[in-house]
Amino acid sequence: MLVWLAEYLVKYHTFFNVFSYLTFRAIVGLLTALIIALWMGPHLIAWLQKMQIGQVVRNEGPESHFSKRGTPTMGGIMILFSIAVSTLLWARLDNPYVWCVLLVLIGYGIIGFIDDYRKVVRKDTRGLIARWKYFWQSVLALAVAFSMYAIGKDTPATQLVVPFFKDVMPQLGMLYILLAYFVIVGTSNAVNLTDGLDGLAIMPTVFVAAGFALVAWATGNVNFASYLKIPYLMHAGELVIVCTAIVGAGLGFLWFNTYPAQVFMGDVGSLALGGALGTIAVLLRQEFLLVIMGGVFVVETLSVILQVGSFKLRGQRIFRMAPIHHHYELKGWPEPRVIVRFWIISLMLVLIGLATLKVR
């Protein structure tokens, strides 16, 4: 939005040229989202406490979690608001990639909000019925997938980028839609599963978003895309703004979510952030890179799948409790140790993922 204003004002003073620089807008976009989140946090937390919108803790969970009962939840509202405002201010709003991510972010946020509202306010332990949750997630994911396929059909925008192989970029055709669907919905639910400890989900989200900011910048730059042997996508550059807004909003939220948490993001935050990361990966043609950089989310999800599968097939559990972060809690690890070690692993995976762009 401000880019258009600056383009009009530049004829009055060359200072406004600075708004045309992607790096400048990325930095101020991050700071804008961070400041909004830091400002909004205390007000939202106070309102959630007043409305008695507190976390519901399962009795079968780790005993250390009982003290979390009643902690304000649905704090993801501040994350989504910060990202949306920052993106609308600093990104070019004629860019279809920006609107795809915002559609999923807000749409999945609404799904998560309804789920949280039913569980916390209506005291319905089921929340939003699973089949309806997946139905609306699917509708939004398919809407984005079909739209982007129509725009980028038979171009690099629908190729599959395979790590380590610079010449392996098959054209997916209609399989693009199927892949996009599973990546967006899968990542959304993976982040949701990971969001079980104070700050556990938000910091890996920040790391992955920061990694994708670099990838988006390279993908949208014809020279760097050629150098790294990845598809050049003309709309990709503006995703840098979205990614840095996620980083800023995530860090602002972490200020209040760090152990011991003053607020939890709830499904309104986790479903939306996961969906946004999945959408960004699809738009950048870096689904495999998401699996590497978002390895913490992948492992958390696999632990649940293996646990459920093992119990149904053999009547035995593999882990003491799933997702796997609860397994380590029940082994006696203090919660902060689990959180920080998962953060370290996440940072390492993001760096490894970025390295694969060059090792081709």
Swiss-Prot record:
Membrane topology: Multi-pass membrane protein
Listed name of the protein: Phospho-N-acetylmuramoyl-pentapeptide-transferase
GO molecular function annotation: metal ion binding; phospho-N-acetylmuramoyl-pentapeptide-transferase activity; UDP-N-acetylmuramoyl-L-alanyl-D-glutamyl-meso-2,6-diaminopimelyl-D-alanyl-D-alanine:undecaprenyl-phosphate transferase activity
InterPro entries: Glycosyl_transferase_4, PNAcMuramoyl-5peptid_Trfase, PNAcMuramoyl-5peptid_Trfase_CS
EC number(s) on file: 2.7.8.13
GO cellular component: plasma membrane
Reported function: Catalyzes the initial step of the lipid cycle reactions in the biosynthesis of the cell wall peptidoglycan: transfers peptidoglycan precursor phospho-MurNAc-pentapeptide from UDP-MurNAc-pentapeptide onto the lipid carrier undecaprenyl phosphate, yielding undecaprenyl-pyrophosphoryl-MurNAc-pentapeptide, known as lipid I.
